[in-house]
Amino acid sequence: MMELLSPAGGFDSLIAAVQTGADAVYMGFGAFNARRSAKNFTDEEFASAVSYCHLRGVRVFLTLNTLLTDRELVQAADALKKACAMGVDAILVQDWGLLTLAREIVPDVPLHASTQMSLFTLGGANEAAALGMERVVLARELNRDEVREICAGCPAEIEIFIHGALCMCYSGQCEMSAVVGERSGNRGACAQPCRLPYGVDGPCRGGHPLSLKDANLSAYLGEMAEMGVDCLKLEGRMKRPEYVAVITGIYRRLLDEKRRPTAEESRRLEQAFSRSGFTDGYWLGKKGPQMFGTRPENAPEPKELFAEARAQYENGRENRRIPVSLAIRVQAGKPVSLAVACQSNNGLMNVWAQGPVPETARSRALTAEELRERLSKTGGTVFTVEQFRAELDDGLMLPASVINGLRRDALEGLKQRLEQDWFLRRMSPWQKEELRQGRDPHVRRVLEAAALPEAPEPPKTMRFTCSVLKAQQVTAALLAEKPAIVYVPIEELERLDAGLDWGETELCAVLPRIFRTADEPVLRQLLERHPEATAVAVGNLGHLPIVRGLGRTLRGDFGLNIFNSRALLFWREQGLSSATASFELRWQQVRDLNKHLPCEAIVYGRLPLMVMENCVTRCNVGCTHGAGSVLTDRTGAQFPVTCGYGCRCEIQNSRTLFLADKPEMHRCGLTYGRLRFTTETPEQCAAVLRRYKDGGDWTPDDMTRGLFYRGVE
């Protein structure tokens, strides 16, 4: 049976999810999760939530799926230890540094690769599995055949989103909220700029070309089960508890009854929340304008539907009762005893409670039926009496308070035993031994014991590199300025001028950030066809199997989202020779990185904001055959839309990052500073490099300092 995974943005939502049929819930506590604006949980609430779920057989997954700075990793280590101590069943991660930290501090807690890791190929999923990921959450953009292929070939469990909001950009690759509004989607603070109006190749007139409808894949659960999907994820940690109850309840029934939704159930899903209806476009491989939709700000609340939903979980309603057997012995001259038993993960579990010696009845004697009636009053608990047996001598009496007290004590004891049983079940042998020895069973190594090795001294001077969008931007004039590296998209290599003199400049082939399993052999063949590209830019975990064994120098691209020193160390261990730091970091944070790898930063150019599966150009003005378009926002700012590998388009920033006049750029311990050319002419490319190297007078018309000084939330 596939697992149904529901969102829990707060305790009310958690109760709603559990009581309407979730097999597992995902939730966050603290600041380090991809929905920081959700209510989330305090430490105490989280511990109570774990107990609440485990008692009812529901698993709890902690979301620590954001990018973290070096300082934040110290706090994250504490969160890891607390989560393990509370009995969390798995942890979702995005950050490469947190991945290595979790393996050292809580090595036996299962890790799940968040969709923020941007995994969408069989090769990438297998790399994640090789790193110890028990589960991989796939990108929402995959179609049914691509999911089927990954399920068939990956040893890790596969989780997919089946209902809820769709981002326009691939998860983990969106920088629009960060660059435009200083609120990072990679750090759980997305401001959702994709829901705002824009114009395409014209002024903004109120259209919403970046706003996708919510996904609804309720009609395809049967084929998901057949292809081997392990977990079905419902999106919605920012949504109300009533919404969680509605969608969880409907999907629970569909799974249990192995059927498609009725017209009424489909209507209820849409009534709970939608944006002009739903879409199944990605799953079916049918992209296009029909996938886009909006939701009015004053959309009415479905009061009747939500009232019905609340009735399913409010006021202590318990839909997931545990059947128990009760056996009471009331004998003359002996203390009364009550045994309660239920099935647990380790077989039958028994708990005993003992009371006083019964008295001789002065008038009416105690009956077995009276005992059954009082002991069966389990309201307010998770238990329900399924079997009852009484051994009762004649002529005895017990006060009602004693009977009720026996019931409370026995059921409370059973509750505690069940919670402990769940925790011990997922404890590893070494943890059980630590517990037996009276030591902390939750943490094998403290943070200090897992200190980073000393990094080499960074270089005193920074060399400049260039990346281009098109081959014609690489000219003799550019190479005459002797850039250390020139990054060229792999599909543009064959268009380079064969007569160029590269001198000591390294030619680095850039693999596409977004690709598919079917592209893996194609990309490898392109690399083999171009041995002159002695280096390869790696921007995704799925690139590693493509480049492995080719003997090329590997350089980490910005798509890896390197945010801390541990991430640099991780990628060094994967064979990289240099790596690009996230451009969300302030210059002080870049400076303070322990440079376990030669480090690069983008210091010029239009920063990439979104990379998309749905072409914003084709959906709005028709295909321009690679020429792209221009996106205009409400303020008149214009964002170029460029076209790349596989006809996937990318939104570039409206303003050009320019730091040539900022000396801090040279004080960060960087080995390389990258000049990122997108819309520049070949002449401008050479002029910009001269400006950065020799202090020329070239400046862009509309410039920004990026996040180098501002940083992000």
Q: What residues fall within each predicted segment?
A:
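Active-site pocket-lining/capping segments in soluble small-molecule metabolic enzymes
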Residues: M1-L119, V137-L138, E146-C231, M238-E713
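Conserved nucleotide-cofactor-binding alpha/beta core module
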Residues: L122-G123
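Long, basic N-terminal domains or extensions that often function
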Residues: E134
